[in-house]
Swiss-Prot record:
Record flagged with keyword Zinc-finger: no
Keywords from the UniProt entry: Repeat, TPR repeat
TPR repeats: 8-41, 58-91, 92-125
Keyword Repeat listed: yes
Protein name, entry field: Tetratricopeptide repeat protein 32
Gene3D superfamilies membership: Tetratricopeptide repeat domain (1.25.40.10)
Lineage: superkingdom: Eukaryota
InterPro entries in UniProt: TPR-like_helical_dom_sf, TPR_rpt
Gene designation: TTC32
Length: 151
């Protein structure tokens, strides 16, 4: 069991190295393998020590989501960010990443909720503060345009 845990950790470390080098296809394959391995461990009767840590699993989902975001597969990326949040609800980064996509797609109310959650979890997250302010401004502008269009 210890060997499986070390192998899983090595997979995650290698995935991160590929990610940092911009080798996204390799990183995505390794993150996916890690996520599958965690799902198998969680669904089997293995001892709790053999399962993946929530932090590592959430990081794998978040980083795989980033790769999908880079490919402009926004909905798939949001699925991974949501999975990261479900595994580790106090991990602010996937809320921020999902909020960015929601903002880009024009779902300002949902983006606002994610950015507010980031700041609840980490009040010093400057990019989230800026994104929240920009989302509010763009939502107000959209509302002004809609009102003007209806006259």
């Amino acid at each position: 069991m210890e060997g499986q845990r070390q192998e899983s950790h090595a997979t995650l470390t290698l995935a991160q190295a590929h990610f940092n080098n911009g080798e996204y296809a390799e990183a995505e394959a390794l993150y996916s393998a890690y996520i599958r391995r965690c799902a198998c461990a969680a669904s089997s009767d293995e001892s709790p020590g053999s399962k993946c840590s929530p932090e590592d699993l959430a990081t794998a989902y978040n980083n795989r989501g980033q790769i999908k975001y880079f490919r402009v597969d926004f909905y798939e990326a949001m699925d991974d960010y949501t999975s990261a949040i479900e595994v580790q609800p106090n991990f602010e980064v996937p809320y921020y990443n999902r909020g960015l996509i929601l903002y880009r797609l024009g779902y300002f109310d949902d983006a606002l909720e994610d950015f507010k959650k980031v700041l609840d979890l980490n009040p010093g997250f400057q990019d989230a503060t800026l994104s929240l302010k920009q989302t509010i401004l763009d939502k107000e502008e959209k509302q002004r345009r809609n009102v003007a269009k209806n006259y």
